[in-house]
Amino acid sequence: MMAATTLTMTAQTQADDVLNVARKVNNFFMAKYSDPTLPTNVNKVRPSSLWTRAVYYEGLMALNDIDPQLRYVDYTDRWATFHHWTPRNGINTCDADDQCCVQTYLIRYRENHDEAILVRAAANLGHQMQTPNDQKNATAKTKGTQPSLYGWWTWIDAIQMAMPVYMQMYKLTGDEKYRDHAMKMYRWSRNECGGGLFNTKDGLWWRDADYVPPYKEPDGRDCY
């Protein structure tokens, strides 16, 4: 009994330590970027709805799940409202870098039930589901790949940034078209893009279509 109690107390102490570190890191971030509407400026000025900032809000919402604080929600809503709860570069973007922010919008939708959020997300995904990455629509990331209706995720980060948006929409609406299309896009990235971004032999993903064989690092190894 004493051993079990000690283990429980140790586990709780470790959990508290982790939470305290997360709070400190987030407090630093929110103090440094006190105005969430300001653009980012890392070698280039970009809107704060860019993926590099969007992934922070994913983490903030996860922190809010275990450490609920109104200031987390207020900070997030200021950011999202400034960007009109819309993907970076608008409804007609097919770039996962632009869509990443929608993950947080949909998390907030579960709480505020603002139907406009769902409408914008549905419009964006609806556009993508009808738009192939052909010459007319190609971006810098998709040029050089075989045109496909499912061929927008040519780098593996995109799977993390955009696939959850599809699955969130499936869960929120019950419409299987979001789940099914996302899985087709995932399989295209895994099995077809550049000959397939997943190396079944090593069990690792090549970073993007530019790094599949015959590309090698200077030491002759594959680049993951």
Model-derived regions, located:
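Bacterial Sec-dependent N-terminal signal peptides
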Residues: 1-13
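Glycan-recognition and catalytic cores of secretory/periplasmic carbohydrate-active enzymes
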Residues: 12-224
